[in-house]
C-alpha cells in the first residue's frame, strides 16, 4: 500500500480525471479535493454538507451526491458521524442533494434536492451509465 495524499478528513468517491489527477469527496470536511500525481492536494470546491460520492459526467463536469452533512465526534480514537449525545441527524438536516461541479473552476450548480416531490434522505454515491 502506498499513501498518495494526506490531510483529507474522510475521503470517499475517488474519480480518476483525464489529466491524471484524482478527485475525492471529503465527507467530513464538506469539500471536494483534487490530488495531483505528486500527492499535492487542493480544494476544488466547497459545497458544504457531506459530499459522499462523485462521478465524471459525459460533459466533463463532476457530479457530486451529498448526504446533507452530519455531526462528527471521536469515540475510542475513531471519528464517527455521531454527535456527543449519540445523535446522527443534525438540527436543520436537509436530506441531501446533487451538485454539478465544474472540474476546472470549481463552480457549483445545485441540480436536485429530491425526487417526485419528496426530499432526499441522505443519498450515497452516484454513477453514469454512459
Locate each region found by the language model:
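Sequence-structural signature of mature extracellular/luminal beta-sheet repeat domains
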Residues: 1-130
Amino acid at each position: 500500500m502506498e499513501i498518495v495524499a494526506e490531510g483529507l478528513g474522510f475521503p470517499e468517491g475517488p474519480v480518476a480525471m483525464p489529466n491524471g489527477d484524482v478527485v475525492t469527496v471529503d465527507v467530513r470536511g464538506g469539500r471536494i479535493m483534487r490530488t495531483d500525481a505528486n500527492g499535492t492536494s487542493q480544494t476544488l470546491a466547497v459545497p458544504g454538507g457531506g459530499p459522499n460520492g462523485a462521478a465524471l459526467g459525459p460533459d466533463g463536469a463532476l457530479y457530486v451526491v451529498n448526504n446533507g452533512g452530519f455531526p462528527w465526534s471521536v469515540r475510542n480514537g475513531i471519528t464517527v458521524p455521531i454527535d456527543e449525545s449519540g445523535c446522527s441527524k443534525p438540527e436543520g438536516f436537509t436530506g441531501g442533494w446533487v451538485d454539478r461541479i465544474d472540474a476546472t473552476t470549481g463552480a457549483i450548480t445545485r441540480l436536485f434536492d429530491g425526487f417526485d416531490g419528496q426530499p432526499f434522505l441522505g443519498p450515497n454515491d452516484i454513477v453514469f451509465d454512459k
